[in-house]
């Protein structure tokens, strides 16, 4: 609980693994099983005045309570056994009611740019990977279980449940691998330029394999 700073990396819109090569992230309405990457909400955030912002995660007992507490920049989702109110807002922002789970950031953005938030539920078994891709804005995840290794041109970073998440700004290519021995379960945010796709495949950069398991 409480604040979590410096938390950005790997939403998995181009998943593959040995048993399911080339699987992409799909709308949750098309879900056919638990494992995979599922788009659970897309929310226009609007023009953001500052060069950084934060992702606030609160849990409510019921969807009705969460809906009643919604603010501009908020969306209610039911994911991973909980009812979440997810909000893009300044550092220290709070609503009444609910349980504050995390404040993730700062997320580096372009002041004055118009953004949209795409939220996903990611459930990976160890060994699943996300082929190389980029994002049109910062990406963040909140990990409830498991471990993930993210490789970028700057090296590798490890995100674990209970540890500090990883931040990657928009732009650089990345390659993600679910590592460890436990199923990875996470909520994922891509805060992207509203005029661009959230995720784009990257073919010019080849990872070094720093996250091999």
Spell out what each predicted region is.
Residues 30-31, 136-154:
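Glycine- and acidic-residue-biased ligand/ion/polar-headgroup-sensing regions
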Residues 1-3:
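N-terminal secretory signal peptides that target proteins for export/translocation
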Residues 52, 79-83, 149, 169-197:
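Ligand-binding loop in jelly-roll beta-barrel domains
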Residues 112-116, 125-142:
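A short beta-loop-beta micro-motif enriched in histidine and acidic residues
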Residues 114-119, 184:
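Extracytoplasmic
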Residues 5-16:
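Bacterial N-terminal signal peptides
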Residues 28-29, 59-64, 124, 152-173:
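Short acidic-glycine-tyrosine-enriched beta hairpin
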Residues 20-114, 202-213:
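A short, N-terminal "cap"/entry segment at the start of jelly-roll beta-barrel domains
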């Amino acid at each position: 609980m409480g604040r979590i700073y410096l938390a950005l990396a790997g939403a998995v819109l181009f998943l593959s693994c040995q048993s399911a090569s080339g699987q992409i992230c799909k709308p949750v309405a098309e879900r056919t099983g638990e494992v995979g990457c599922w788009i659970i909400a897309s929310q226009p955030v609007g023009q953001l005045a500052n060069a950084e912002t934060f992702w606030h995660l609160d849990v409510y007992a019921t969807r009705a309570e969460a809906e009643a507490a919604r603010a501009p920049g908020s969306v209610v989702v039911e994911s991973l056994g909980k009812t979440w109110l997810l909000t893009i807002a300044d550092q220290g922002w709070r609503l009444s009611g609910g349980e504050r789970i995390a404040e993730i950031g700062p997320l580096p953005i372009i002041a004055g740019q118009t953004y949209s938030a795409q939220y996903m539920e990611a459930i990976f078994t160890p060994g699943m990977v996300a082929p190389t891709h980029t994002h049109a804005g910062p990406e963040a995840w909140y990990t409830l279980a498991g471990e993930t290794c993210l490789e970028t041109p700057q090296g590798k970073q490890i995100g674990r449940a209970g540890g500090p998440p990883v931040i990657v700004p928009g732009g650089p290519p990345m390659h993600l691998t679910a590592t460890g021995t436990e199923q990875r379960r996470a909520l994922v945010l891509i805060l992207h330029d509203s005029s661009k796709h959230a995720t784009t495949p990257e073919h010019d950069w080849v990872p070094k394999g720093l996250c091999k398991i």
